[in-house]
Amino acid sequence: GKDAATHTSGFRAALSTPEIKARIRARSTSFATRMTRHIAHQAPINPGDTVMLVDLGYNGSVQNSVNRMLGSWTGGHVAGRYLILRENDVSALDKRGFIDTRHYDDRALVMLCRSVSILEQLSTERTGSVVDYREDGQPMRKKHTGRTEHDDVRTVARTGAIAFAAESGCAFYRPPALNDDDGRRLSAVGALARLLLLPNAQELALFAGLKHDVNLGTSDTNQLVDEDGAREGLRCGGVGAALSSERLFPAAELQAIDPALNLALLSMARHGIDVRPIDLQTDGLDVPVILADAHEQTTVTLTAWPTHGGFYRLIVPIGISRFTAGIMLGKVAPYAEVAQTTVQAVDDMTRTWADTIQNQVPGAPIFEGMRVLNGALFECAPDSMIVVPPPSARSGAQAVSIVFRPIGVVDAAVVRLAA
């Protein structure tokens, strides 16, 4: 907003002052000196030697930052070698990936990188992350906060991988026809893609307890596989939630919930099919809705669209906190499970699913003529409705969002007649 822009402008102005620039240069030079001392401890480097940075990938951001400094320090060449390389911007640096654009198109690399956080988790060490270097080059690490069970999972996975690498040749009666670099790469990518995109039940159980370290100077972690969160997202937001970029390992979550949907979304991503959530809105359910303010009321018919698992989502515009909405579920079905009632800005609904749910607030529904059977399951009379008063003190056009599962749907013609 306006305040954020003001703070950003002030921050940039402060950075441009001679005093701050000099301080940044001095600290940067000091850090570079400590880091090169650390590198020298790891391997004897002579003038003119090539320094090679080896990492999982995937953009080579560290190399982007230190390439010039390392080259000046050694007077030699700097190279980066990665498992997967997909640069966000072309850097023109010496970078190569075991898997990169020489072998696969950008869409394939994006698919692999979307769920690649699991590889990061399996590759971390029990030692804490390096946050600085001492004057002699020794690393300064933050405290290791990982749980013992995480370490156990990593140990099992690594032990198995090393054992496989040592004994992999024993599985062949004779060498395969494509036993060259390209053939081995093809096999490796196939195995990696299967793990990242179509994990089996045993792998899902192995990954279930892992948490992803956010890094960025914080100790925050996110659940790597959040099946309950993904299921709720599908129920409330449908495919739009499944396509959300906020999920760390979406293929694993969808594979556990709905393998057919997972495979369909993977196919669309692989072939670059530009499918939007609105393209998949079919078999909508007409719902009569009463909109009323202090002076008048009217009845309209709105369409609730399927999300997942038999649930529907109905959006009811209520203006700038103007209208009370009466959703006449009794005209739609004799029974209904109400999963969620929220109020949010209309503008938020045009953005990503993460933006949509970030600013929504719980509604205050009144269940008129609806008898509770069990938890969120209600029996509805023909005149039953959910009444949602408008929220107070919210600016901009608002809308009520109701997620429900009708049971025993009434014929659509009867619904239209009732409206």
Question: Predicted segment positions?
Answer:
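Long, low-complexity, Lys/Arg-enriched
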Residues: 1-288, 406-418
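Flexible, charged surface loops at secondary-structure boundaries
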Residues: 43-49, 317-321, 393-396
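Generic beta-sheet signal
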Residues: 49-53, 323-327, 400
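Mixed-charge (acidic/basic) macromolecular-recognition segments
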Residues: 145-151, 155, 159, 306, ...
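Activation corresponds to long, low-complexity, non-globular regions
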Residues: 271-288, 349-419
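Extracellular carbohydrate recognition and processing domains
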Residues: 294-319, 361-378
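Extracellular beta-strand ligand-recognition surfaces/modules
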Residues: 314-337
